[in-house]
């Protein structure tokens, strides 16, 4: 059985905030519209757990950006947008959580929570494109001597690479805002006509009109 690598921690954790944060926002919306305090208490607890899981997934994602190979400008800039989106969602979630620990939900916090969830969906879509179209993080497409998740030095490497990833995001943002280094074509994931970097092999089966992808 293949041992889990450190950069694989991010995709393993990211499903928790993607499920918990929208649930918390929906519970706050129900509490606000029905004036039911039970929903507000449930939402408060979910915000705490969801924000904590988002923080862990974010740190793991920052580290992963330094542990995989980003060979093309499109891969690097899509990773950049994915990281910026996740960081924005995390800051929004932490802000709403800090408010909700002491106060009841308001229309403003509900709007912020729902907006953060919308951004999380877009960022998650970019993450899917990075893996299934560009092939980021595939076996053999990582940095030399990748760190095992359960190795003794994994915590130190995680913190070190997360800091490097954060510094890389800041430096790339500066280059983008200065106008000297625009985003690569296709980095935003919404351009029409962009072709997948990793083509999917297909195999036609008798009696079927459409080819079926190979496993």
What do the PLM-derived regions correspond to, one by one?
Residues 1-215:
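Short amphipathic, positively biased membrane-proximal segments
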